[in-house]
Design a protein with these regions (language model features):
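Conserved phosphate-binding/catalytic loops in two-lobed NTP-binding clefts
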Residues: 228-257
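Nucleotide/phosphate-binding catalytic cleft detector across ATP-hydrolyzing
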Residues: 1-82, 100-102, 125-127, 134-179, ...
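Short, ordered loop/turn segments at secondary-structure junctions
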Residues: 62-66, 98, 106-109, 134, ...
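Residue-level signature of catalytic and energy-coupling elements of molecular machines
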Residues: 50, 85, 118, 193, ...
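Phosphate/pyrophosphate-binding loops at sites that engage ATP/ADP/AMP, CoA/4′-phosphopantetheine
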Residues: 190, 194-209
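A short acidic Gly-Thr/Ser loop motif
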Residues: 83-90, 96-99, 107-112, 214-219
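A conserved active-site cap/scaffold subdomain adjacent to cofactor or substrate pockets
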Residues: 108-130
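Glycine-rich phosphate-binding loops at beta-strand->alpha-helix junctions
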Residues: 38-39, 137-140, 205-229
């Protein structure tokens, strides 16, 4: 299923890289279209789920495209930027340059893989592992990690659930062991990021800034870890606060939500939405051409 068909590059008389050809004169106009596709069945299931809630679906927007509206600045889009959105199960990577979207890739890995690794390593419940990751997890080691003991259970839940592997009598583990598990999974994820960016030509001098978004970007120290792994500047993308949205939504985990609002407000060009009635299907000459011009004048003036 086609989600988007948007102009990536315009060409005027053989000159590439024209951002907006409106108002320019040329003998020949060309356009390279970036098409975003997805499996049809999951998209239709999502649409039906929304419609079951008695809501209408105006459009389906790819998450990387929406997040870019919330987290990437126009200057970054122009100079070259890669947006890496770390979700629960999937990490989406989009590359932008010259103000246009140039490539998209998805990696079937996400922050849930870190949670599962913690649960497996310490033999604890997944809910306990998720709490450890969010509260005490970090992508950067500290000299005090070996001496710092962190409780596996949340306050008020002492004695519940299994005793963690390697824990003390109070069911506490060394923070260094937790950080080791987190960084091991992150190393695998950043390796996939590096390969995907290279496949899209975002490497060496052709690459630029990297922006992290998604719930996985809220892990402590992840920007520094990814920057060291990819060898380029990395920042955390935080969406702007919108009137009517809670303050808690101005975090990387809600980048897609805020981006959907901004995308709908911007209403970018999609080739599929262009009215075919304004596209000539045959050549006009003589009186036919004159009549065509007069018809256009009447329609617009």
């Amino acid at each position: 299923m086609v989600l988007h068909a948007q102009p990536a590059h315009y060409t005027l008389d053989g000159a590439h890289g024209v951002a907006n050809p409106a108002g320019l004169h040329a003998e020949a106009l060309g356009v390279d279209i970036h098409v975003t596709v997805a499996e049809g069945a999951p998209v239709r299931n999502l649409i039906e789920a929304v419609q079951t809630a008695h809501l209408d679906v105006e459009a389906v927007v790819a998450s990387p495209l929406a997040s870019a509206y919330a987290c990437v600045t126009p200057e970054e889009r122009e100079l070259g930027v890669a947006l890496i959105e770390i979700g629960a199960q999937v990490t989406n990577i989009s590359v932008h340059s010259a103000g246009m979207l140039l490539g998209l890739k998805s990696i079937p890995l996400g922050s849930n893989d870190i949670t599962d690794a913690i649960a497996s390593s310490f033999g604890i419940r997944r809910s306990q592992a998720e709490r450890l990751k969010c509260v005490s997890g970090s992508a950067m080691a500290s000299p005090t990690d070996h001496s710092e003991m962190i409780p596996v259970n949340a306050p008020g839940e002492e004695g519940e659930g299994p005793i963690a592997r390697g824990a003390d009598e109070h069911n506490r583990i060394a923070r260094a062991e937790l950080v080791a598990v987190v960084t091991d999974r992150l190393a695998h994820l950043t390796g996939e990021m590096h390969r995907s960016l290279k496949d899209m030509g975002f490497s060496g001098s052709r690459g630029g800034q990297v922006v992290l978004a998604g719930g996985g970007a809220e892990l402590h120290g992840i920007a520094e870890f990814v920057q060291a792994a990819l060898g380029r500047p990395v920042r955390i993308g935080k969406p702007p606060r919108l009137q009517g949205l809670p303050e808690a939504h101005a975090t990387p985990g809600f980048a897609s939500l805020v981006g959907l609002c901004l995308y709908a407000a911007d209403d970018p060009v999609d080739i599929r939405s262009v009215d075919p009635g304004y596209q000539p299907t045959r050549r006009y000459s003589g009186f036919g051409l004159v009549n065509r011009v007069l018809q256009a004048v009447r329609e617009y003036f």
